[in-house]
C-alpha cells in the first residue's frame, strides 16, 4: 500500500469515526427533545381519551365524546407532523452525503502531495512522545520523593519511639530521686521542729528556775 493509499485509509477512518460520533450526539439530543414532546402528547391523550365502553354508561357523553376524541386525534397528528422526525431524515441524508464526499480525493490531494499530513502526524507524534517522557520523568521524581519522605517518616517514628522510651525510663528515676529528696526534707523539718520544741522547753525550765 502506497503513501497516498495509507493516508486516504487513515483519513477515511478518522472521518467515519467523527461522523458516527456526531450522529450519536445528535441522536441523543433529538431523543431528549422527542421525549419531552411525546410526554406533552401523552398528557393530551390521557386527559381527553375515554374508552368507548364508558360512552354506554353515560348517554349524555355518547354524542359529545366521539367528536372530542376525533379532535384530539387530529391534534395528535398535527403534533407528530411538527416534530423533528423530518429534520432527522434530512440530517441523515446530509451525513451520508458528507461521508460520500469525504471518501473522494478532492480537496485532499494537495494535503497529501505536499507532505502536510506527514508533517502534522510527525509533529503530533513528537509532541506526545515528549509529553510521555516528561510525564514518566515527573512520575519517577515523584516516586523517589515519596520514598525519601517515607524514609524520613520512618526515621522520625523510630527516633520518636526511642525518645518516648527514654522518657519512660527517666520518669521512675526522677520519681525515686524526688522521693529521696522529699524524705530528707521531711526528716530535716522534723528534726528542726523537735530541736525547737526542746529549746523552748529548756527555755521554760530555765525561766521557771530563775523565777523561783
Swiss-Prot record:
GO terms for cellular component: membrane. This is Uncharacterized protein MG331. It is a single-pass membrane protein. The chain crosses the membrane at residues 186-206. It is found in: Membrane. Keywords: Membrane, Transmembrane, Transmembrane helix.
